[in-house]
């Protein structure tokens, strides 16, 4: 043998696999022989036809042997050895199939190939007798768009037809005959068509007999929740019929549509064929007729009709003593649709008979083309209404339906003996028809059906509805049925139904759909659908009629069919329980049983005790592959037996009545059998190194195990569940949970058994075993089942079952002992039951053992060995783990039996297990009273402290245990910490202390992992930690703490206190979600407080400290108010913004400013949107108090004292027209006392004033009219005094700056350590970044990079230089761009308050100077902060020495001397707050500030602009002349786009164009320094233009320069030039005023004033 290699096949040596042995059917004694001429290739699959066969080898090649008349060469027609199909070489074939005379193959990419006989179109080729070589069949789905080629999974071939199963689980058919299932009369069909009737269903397998087809279809998912419709959607007949006679009731729910097909009227006319299949129960009731009637060939239709109706009337005459006149029960129960036209039917039948059965002469029957077809038609026609049948007969017939009719009340009649009625009662729905149809029912038949019925699933495949609620049939077994007394016949059916409903508990033991397992393993929830010719009953519908379309064989529902085989005229269905149902022709005993009739599925009786795991059906025989005791498959044959030589008696040319065991044990292990007409073939594997034997052992034991589990489920579990008084609801629920998990496990085992059977048919690679690849499926199912059964055990389930179940258990003691494998007769029933329930767990040991056996067949280094070895230990580990779980459960149960009863009820839980308790391990409470009793019980989820009649439960997830150090005086002490308690336990000895500590630690650890029920498989999860973590996640409800009473916390803990992220919820709806520290809210968090009165909630998001709101936050009130700002001790404290109401609400307003202890105090701005007023001033205790300014939307301006929210004391009031009042006020806008009123023209009144401004003022005083000659100094000084009563700029927004200093760790401005400040900045950035990571807003990449660069502190060593100044400037720009940085936050807040102050009503020209002062104040205060952070930065106005030499000297624009720095220092070299900070601050504040400038200069700007527009109407030459520009500076030529053009008198906007463009950029800059650079550049552009035209160096004098610059300013057309000029003037650095830029600015200013005075002549 080869050395063992990687794959399992190679490990064995491929020579010893897939050996082909062939037998001749019916010859005895049977001697198998090797296939003549076949070499040693491993065969995976074989298929046999009538005289030929096909082999598929492991490498995907196909060989044909036998008689091959379609081949071209004479040698190839009868080859001596199998010949290779060359057309398929290069294609990897995965499956093959043969019909009687044709073959098919499917490649791995889903293409089907056909070859052989094609007279009926069975090879999908038109007009060709033979297809000599494999030819690809084109199958395309015309419904799909675009057209898609259909990929094929499996083929099945009959005599004249072929079916293909596609990868999307649909059936495609071609060939000839009704067995195609297509609605057509045009045969042959050579283009594959979809069998529409099964479209949308999942078809698992197809099989073809000679002239019939079978399909295995997955059941639809249960529609339990949908209401059952009353009528059939297709034929509108009642789905449930009830006939209520005087003395009996018949209820039937076995409605079946004719052909199961939707019929429109037009279809009915066009295709009369569709009505050919009557509803099944009707046919079923007639089966005696068809079994016993043979109509002669030459009889006319009429004769047959009469004959059959005569049969119908007379067939039951044996028991009809009283004839009740009336309509036949059959037709009254359900109106069968009559044919549209009898003639059409006959025509159709004639057409069909042309394609009738091609009988083999060997079959011993003459061709009878018309007979079966006429038989089909008869039952469809209405019986004549006068037909007299007894009501009794109709009851018998309705009982006999093969689909299963429920009889609701017994029928009392002398004609029908009780025994017969009982026989009908005790048959299962599946067997009913079979037994009723046979003339006599033997005791064996009755016994057989009883057993079958007990095994049957209770709720599978049954419909329920309001009419049919008689569930005793399913839940209470056959025995209960015999107890219906005769007197019930007088009771109304409704009462009967009510009684039945009360008594029965419905238990569904069929597991629900389990997605994962069903996707990986074969489904057991299947239905069998059949169609085609049915003359021999091979369709299984209880009649001998053909079906043109698939129809479900109802009595196989719930039988878990996993494989179908079709012989010539019979069918076999193999179930997951290793049973075989057979139906159809039984001429030679090929069904494996002699029961009658053979038109419905009956169990084949194979004498072996073991189950069948594979079947094959030949033309007139069947093969059964069974499990044997030594796991080597045994082969049974049932069917035709040829007579021995010299024995010519015709009766010997029959068959075996019972299946015969063939002796083939010497061959090896048969993996697959295939049957043809005269021969059958087996594929055999040699058992090398025990590999094959181990695989067979695994498969056989799994199938047996499934049978045992099924028996336990049906014979023990179901009866137990249906018992009355099962105890408490909990017990019943637990038992139901056990039953449901048991069912799930049982179903999985059934699926696995089926998958192992198909695994043995294939390549048999160990690595593809489901138990290896998807071991978690099995491990989880066993674990779940063990959990449920141990829970049941702990709750005393078995003890509670004892009483109600004792009768049942006593009656079934032998069965119990047999199933549970308990041999000792003295064992108590409950113990046996206990053993029985724990039986499945043992299977894990078997898995481990078999996998280990398989592993030994591989080299130790191979991956297979490793995988098998690992899986084996996984299963073994789980088995031991579950064994421990069982012991724990028994130990816990023992404890509950001794525990005081009252406490048991509250403490006993299904999943709770006892670990240890202090009655046997001395443990006492420290400082306990002398007479107190303290009992400590450790469970897997809690530590219980019991005292007398009270107890306290401490959940383990929130319990911390630590040993006390000896210094603490606790020698054997354990300190226990829980969220609200702390106590010390003293143990008697150090050993006890260690034991308890270890037990508690392990229990806590297990509780935290949440893995107490999980097995220790997987990666290293079995490693126990020495002690549980101090920091952990857990959930806890407080019961003691007054603040937290009844609140539930879910989150992180540290040593008994919430610490880290968590959620705290109070019963009244309050909720906090965020960070905790030492048990208190601390850090960033969100808090919600419901406001029941307003049906809304208050909501806070922000920072907390020691359980209180502290730091920045946003509080949204239920009233709609929102506060954003600082908090301290749950109160608003510091800078904040309060928004009240929306613009549409009754009192919208906004306040931004300082708060102290929840009240407005200090400087603040209040915007009263309703009144259109804005107050900017001081506050105290929520009212305006002190100096302040009020502006209104009507242009009024007040500046002065406020007291208790009112203008009171001295003040100044200005109106829009510059009227001024300066004096005393007593209320808002109310003058009261001494004062001076000055008119816009300078006249003024001094005296006493009283009254409200704007509504008449009473004056007592003197009127002054200043003379024209009075100088300015004698005029009122009001305008000069105007800013005296406003709040000084440095007093504004102190809280904002204080907050920034506080963030840097300073008590006040400049009071702190620099290193500490930088540490605080780093912390602020990191925490903010962490919070941002959790928040939904994702930072952009550039923002992240900025943050990272800000975390580096700029280091400056050595003398301060321009480079270092530049570094600081860059750092500040980044910092101010990032709100997470304290400086960025400061700038953001200042921008917000500035805009809030000077936007809207605040955009008042009177406020301009205030606004400018405020900016200067910001600069001063921010510069102080910057100098604190960068101590090496020189103070304001200092000059930084230049480190690099000066660039090449540039001559001064004005003086012509070389530029000397001392005279005109450049900005950037002199350190000023505005130079450093304005570039950061001003762009953000520019819009409101510039608006104030524009308002203030409104009038003069209008005059300026009018002049600009007027002067700009002139052409260049005229304007230059008008402005007095010297002619030598006039450009003569201009270069436009590289071309030189002469300046003409009409030329406009062309001279000095570059200078004009340059000056226009002044409006796009923000800071004065940038604006000054623009002006300087403009001058240089003018200079360049003049130099170009003069071609000589010269010096500008102001007289020469001014007119030229004036021209440029005019042409630049800057709309708000005045505002620009004033802004520069107010904010430029003072040191620039006398330098070059200062002079240039003065020139611009002069131009502005000059333009206003220009008059154009």
UniProtKB/Swiss-Prot annotation:
The modification Phosphothreonine is found at residue 510. Residues 690-885 form the DH domain. Keywords: Acetylation, Guanine-nucleotide releasing factor, Phosphoprotein, Repeat. GO terms for molecular function: guanyl-nucleotide exchange factor activity; protein homodimerization activity; protein serine/threonine kinase activator activity; small GTPase binding. Residues 432-481 are annotated as: Disordered. The keyword Repressor does not apply. This is Alsin.
């Amino acid at each position: 043998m080869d050395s063992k290699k990687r794959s399992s096949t190679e490990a064995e040596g491929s020579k010893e696999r897939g050996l082909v042995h062939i037998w001749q059917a019916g010859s005895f004694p049977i001697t198998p022989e090797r296939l003549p001429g076949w070499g040693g290739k491993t065969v995976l699959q074989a298929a046999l036809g009538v005289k030929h066969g096909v082999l598929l080898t492991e490498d995907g090649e196909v060989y044909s042997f036998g008689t091959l008349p379609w081949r071209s060469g004479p040698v190839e027609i009868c080859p001596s050895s199998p010949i290779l199909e060359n057309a398929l070489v290069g294609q990897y074939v995965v499956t093959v199939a043969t019909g009687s005379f044709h073959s098919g193959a499917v490649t791995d990419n889903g293409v089907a190939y056909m070859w052989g006989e094609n007279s009926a179109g069975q090879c999908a080729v038109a007009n060709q007798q033979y297809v000599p070589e494999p030819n690809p069949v084109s199958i395309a789905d015309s419904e799909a768009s675009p057209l898609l080629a259909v990929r094929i999974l499996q083929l099945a071939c009959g005599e004249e037809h072929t079916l293909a199963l596609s990868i999307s689980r649909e059936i495609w058919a071609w060939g000839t005959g009704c067995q195609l299932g297509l609605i057509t009369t045009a045969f042959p069909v050579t283009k594959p068509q979809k069998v529409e009737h099964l479209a949308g269903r999942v078809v698992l397998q197809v099989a073809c007999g000679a002239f019939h087809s079978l399909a295995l279809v997955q059941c639809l998912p249960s529609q339990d929740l949908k209401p059952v419709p009353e009528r059939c959607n297709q034929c509108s007949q009642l789905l449930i019929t009830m006939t209520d006679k005087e003395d009996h009731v018949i209820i039937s729910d076995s409605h079946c549509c004719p052909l199961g097909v939707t019929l429109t009227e037009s279809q009915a006319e066009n295709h009369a064929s569709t009505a050919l299949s009557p509803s099944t129960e009707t046919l079923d009731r007639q089966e005696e007729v068809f079994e016993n009637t043979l109509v002669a060939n030459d009889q006319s239709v009429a004769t047959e009709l009469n004959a059959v109706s005569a049969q119908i009337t007379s067939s039951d005459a044996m028991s009809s003593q009283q004839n009740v006149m009336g309509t036949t029960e059959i037709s009254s129960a359900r109106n069968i649709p009559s044919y549209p036209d009898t003639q059409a039917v006959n025509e159709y039948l004639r057409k069909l008979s042309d394609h009738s059965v091609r009988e083999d002469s060997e079959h011993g029957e003459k061709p009878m083309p018309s007979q079966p077809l006429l038989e089909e038609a008869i039952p469809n026609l209405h019986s004549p209404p006068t037909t007299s049948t007894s009501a009794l007969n109709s009851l018998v017939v309705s009982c006999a339906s093969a689909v299963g009719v429920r009889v609701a009340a017994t029928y009392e009649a002398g004609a029908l003996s009780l025994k017969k009625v009982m026989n009908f009662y005790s048959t299962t729905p599946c067997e009913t028809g079979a037994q009723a149809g046979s003339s006599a029912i033997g005791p064996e038949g009755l016994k057989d059906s009883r057993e079958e019925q007990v095994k049957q699933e209770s709720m599978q495949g049954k419909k329920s509805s309001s009419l049919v609620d008689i569930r005793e049939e399913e839940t209470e077994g056959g025995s209960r049925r015999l107890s219906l007394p005769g007197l019930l016949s007088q009771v109304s059916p409704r009462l009967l139904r009510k009684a039945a409903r009360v008594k029965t508990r419905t238990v569904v033991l069929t597991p629900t759909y389990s997605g994962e397992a069903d996707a990986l393993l074969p489904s057991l929830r299947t239905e069998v659908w059949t169609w085609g010719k049915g003359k021999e009953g091979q369709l299984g519908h209880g009649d001998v009629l053909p079906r043109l379309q698939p129809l479900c064989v109802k009595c196989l529902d719930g039988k878990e069919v996993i494989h179908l085989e079709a012989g010539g005229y019979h069918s076999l269905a193999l179930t997951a329980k290793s049973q075989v149902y057979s139906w159809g022709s039984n001429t030679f005993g090929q069904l494996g049983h002699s029961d009658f009739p053979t038109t419905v599925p009956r169990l084949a009786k194979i004498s072996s005790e073991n189950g069948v795991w594979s079947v094959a059906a030949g033309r007139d025989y069947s093969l059964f592959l069974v499990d044997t005791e030594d796991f080597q498959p045994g082969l049974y044959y049932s069917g035709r037996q040829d007579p021995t030589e010299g024995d010519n008696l015709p009766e010997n040319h029959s068959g075996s009545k019972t299946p015969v065991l063939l002796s083939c044990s010497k061959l090896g292990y048969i993996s697959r059998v295939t049957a043809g007409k005269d021969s059958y073939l087996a594929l055999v594997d040699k058992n090398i190194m025990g590999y094959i034997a181990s695989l067979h052992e695994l498969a056989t034991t799994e199938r047996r195990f499934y049978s045992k589990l099924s028996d336990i489920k049906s014979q023990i579990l179901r009866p137990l569940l249906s018992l009355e008084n099962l105890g408490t609801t909990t017990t019943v629920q637990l038992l139901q949970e056990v039953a449901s998990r048991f069912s799930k496990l049982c179903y999985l085992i059934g699926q696995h058994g089926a998958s192992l059977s198909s695994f043995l048919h294939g390549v048999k690679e160990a690595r593809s075993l489901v138990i290896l690849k998807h071991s978690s499926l099995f491990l989880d199912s066993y674990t779940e089942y063990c959990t449920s059964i141990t829970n049941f055990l702990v709750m005393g389930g078995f003890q509670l079952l004892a009483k109600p179940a004792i009768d049942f258990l006593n009656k079934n003691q032998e069965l119990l002992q047999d199933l549970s494998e308990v041999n000792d007769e003295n064992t108590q029933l409950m113990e046996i039951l206990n053993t029985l329930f724990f039986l499945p767990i043992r299977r894990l040991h078997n898995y481990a053992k078999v996998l280990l056996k398989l592993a030994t067949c591989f080299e130790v280094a191979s991956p297979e060995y490793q995988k098998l070895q690992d899986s084996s230990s996984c299963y073994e580990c789980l088995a031991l783990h579950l064994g421990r779980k069982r012991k724990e459960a028994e130990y816990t149960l023992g404890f509950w039996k001794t525990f005081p009863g009252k406490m048991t009820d509250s403490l006993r839980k299904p999943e709770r297990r006892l670990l240890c308790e202090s009655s046997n391990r001395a443990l006492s409470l420290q400082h306990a009273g002398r007479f107190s009793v303290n009992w400590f019980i450790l469970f897997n989820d809690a530590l219980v402290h019991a005292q007398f009649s009270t107890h306290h439960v401490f959940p383990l997830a929130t319990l911390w245990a630590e040993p006390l150090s000896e210094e603490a005086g606790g020698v054997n002490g354990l300190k226990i910490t829980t969220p609200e308690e702390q106590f010390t336990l003293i143990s008697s000895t150090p050993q006890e202390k260690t034991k308890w500590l270890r037990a508690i630690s392990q229990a806590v650890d297990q509780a935290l992992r949440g893995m107490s029920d999980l097995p220790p498989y997987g990666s290293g999860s079995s490693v126990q930690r020495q002690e549980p973590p101090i920091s952990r996640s857990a959930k806890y409800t407080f019961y003691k703490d007054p603040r937290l009473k009844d609140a539930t916390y879910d989150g992180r803990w540290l040593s008994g206190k919430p610490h880290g992220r968590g959620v705290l919820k109070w019963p009244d709806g309050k909720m906090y979600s965020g960070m905790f520290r030492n048990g208190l809210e601390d850090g960033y968090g969100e808090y919600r407080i419901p406001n029941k009165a307003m049906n809304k909630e208050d909501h806070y998001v922000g920072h907390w400290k020691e359980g209180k709101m502290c730091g920045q936050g946003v509080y949204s009130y239920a009233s709609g108010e929102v506060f954003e700002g600082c908090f301290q001790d749950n109160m608003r404290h510091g800078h904040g913004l309060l928004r009240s109401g929306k613009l549409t609400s009754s009192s919208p307003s906004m306040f931004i400013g300082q708060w102290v202890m929840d009240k407005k105090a200090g400087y603040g701005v209040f915007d009263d949107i309703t009144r259109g007023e804005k107050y900017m001033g001081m506050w105290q205790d929520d009212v305006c108090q002190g100096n302040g300014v009020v502006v209104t939307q009507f242009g009024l301006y007040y500046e002065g004292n406020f007291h208790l929210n009112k203008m009171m004391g001295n003040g100044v009031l200005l109106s829009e027209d510059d009227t001024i009042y300066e004096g005393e006020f007593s209320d808002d806008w109310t003058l009261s006392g001494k004062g001076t009123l000055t008119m816009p023209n300078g006249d003024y009144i001094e005296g006493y004033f009283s009254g409200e401004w704007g509504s008449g003022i009473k004056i007592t005083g003197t009127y002054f009219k200043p003379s024209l000659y009075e100088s300015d100094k004698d005029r009122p000084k009001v305008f000069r005094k105007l800013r005296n009563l406003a709040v000084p700029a440095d007093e504004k927004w102190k809280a904002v700056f204080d907050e920034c200093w506080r963030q840097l760790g300073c008590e006040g401005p400049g009071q702190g350590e620099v290193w500490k400040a930088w540490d605080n900045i780093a912390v602020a950035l990191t925490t903010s970044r962490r919070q941002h990571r959790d928040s939904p807003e994702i930072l952009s990449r550039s923002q992240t990079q900025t943050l990272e660069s800000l975390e580096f502190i700029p280091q400056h060593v050595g003398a301060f230089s321009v480079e270092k100044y530049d570094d600081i400037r860059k750092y500040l720009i980044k910092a101010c761009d990032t709100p997470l940085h304290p400086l960025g936050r400061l700038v953001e807040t200042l921008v917000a308050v500035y805009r809030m102050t000077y936007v809207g009503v605040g955009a008042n020209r009177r406020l301009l100077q205030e606004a400018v002062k405020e900016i200067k104040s910001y600069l001063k205060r921010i510069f102080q902060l910057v100098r604190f952070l960068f101590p090496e930065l020189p103070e304001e106005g200092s000059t930084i020495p230049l480190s690099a030499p000066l660039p090449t000297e540039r001559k001064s624009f004005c003086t012509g001397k070389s530029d000397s720095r001392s005279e005109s220092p450049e900005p950037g070299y002199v350190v000023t707050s505005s130079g450093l900070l304005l570039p950061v601050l001003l762009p953000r504040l520019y819009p409101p500030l510039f608006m104030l400038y524009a308002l203030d200069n409104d009038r003069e700007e209008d005059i300026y602009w009018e002049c600009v527009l007027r002067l700009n109407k002139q052409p260049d030459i005229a304007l230059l002349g008008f402005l007095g520009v010297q002619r030598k500076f006039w450009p003569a030529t201009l270069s436009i786009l590289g071309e030189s053009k002469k300046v003409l008198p009409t030329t406009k906007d062309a001279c000095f164009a570059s200078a004009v463009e340059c000056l226009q950029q002044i409006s796009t800059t923000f800071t004065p320094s940038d604006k000054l650079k623009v002006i300087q550049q403009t001058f240089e552009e003018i200079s360049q233009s003049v130099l170009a035209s003069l071609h000589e160096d010269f010096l500008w004098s102001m007289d020469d320069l001014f007119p030229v610059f004036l021209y440029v300013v005019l042409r630049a057309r800057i709309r708000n030039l005045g505002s620009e000029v004033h802004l520069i003037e107010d904010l430029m650095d003072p040191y620039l005023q006398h330098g070059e830029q200062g002079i240039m600015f003065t020139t611009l200013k002069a131009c502005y004033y000059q333009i206003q005075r220009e008059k154009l002549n």
